[in-house]
């Protein structure tokens, strides 16, 4: 069965207009935590807004959040780092690649900071998959005393742009609490 995700992408006003007119997102570089691809926050427009505001140093007036549906077709693979099975798989894959990686990269390479991104890119080159989904701690957001849940955001990195349902790309217009 196909899997659908409702996602949000934060960007500048200028980039949002380009995305809406071309129905195309720009892929990130290779030095990102989930590797090369187009990044989204799953079900969380507020995190998309906060992230781009801090990361790109934009004012609230210059930030735009786009809503987009993603579809992973039944015959495509999705790597879900929210599950033990997929986390175990990627960690084992990294262990098997480690010697090759150490021979290839200097100890000062950014790989050692965003190891999963490089491993995910190596994996994609050998065995393409549609997207990867992972939970990360929300920066500067400690757990609330007495509450057991983790303060996390779900990030999605699309590796195959065909997952992006171009007809669903639109501005997120609901107010975002800041």
Residue ranges of predicted features:
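ADP-ribose/NAD+-binding catalytic cleft of ART/PARP-like enzymes
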Residues: 1-33
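Extracellular structured ligand-interaction cores
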Residues: 5, 35-38, 63-67
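Short, flexible loop/turn elements at secondary-structure junctions
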Residues: 8-14, 38-45, 70-74
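Cytochrome P450 catalytic domain signature, combining two hallmark sequence patches
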Residues: 26-27, 55-67
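Extended catalytic/binding region for NAD+/ADP-ribose chemistry, centered on the ART fold
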Residues: 28-55
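Active-site and NAD+-binding cores of ADP-ribose-processing enzymes
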Residues: 64-178
């Amino acid at each position: 069965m196909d899997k659908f995700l409702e996602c949000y992408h934060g960007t500048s006003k200028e980039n949002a207009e380009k995305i809406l007119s071309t129905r195309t997102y720009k892929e990130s570089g290779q030095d990102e935590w989930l590797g090369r691809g187009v990044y989204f926050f799953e079900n969380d427009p507020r995190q998309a807004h906060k992230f781009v505001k801090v990361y790109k140093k934009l004012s609230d007036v210059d930030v735009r959040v786009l809503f987009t549906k993603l579809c992973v077709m039944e015959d495509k693979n999705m790597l879900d780092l929210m599950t033990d099975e997929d986390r175990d798989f990627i960690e084992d894959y990294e262990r098997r690649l480690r010697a090759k990686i150490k021979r290839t990269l200097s100890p000062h390479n950014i790989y050692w900071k965003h190891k999963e991104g490089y491993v995910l890119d190596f994996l994609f080159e050998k065995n393409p998959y549609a997207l990867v989904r992972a939970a990360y701690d929300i920066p500067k957001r400690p757990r609330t005393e007495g509450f057991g849940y983790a303060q996390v955001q779900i990030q999605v990195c699309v590796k195959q742009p065909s997952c992006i349902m171009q007809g669903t790309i639109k501005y997120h217009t609901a107010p975002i609490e800041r």
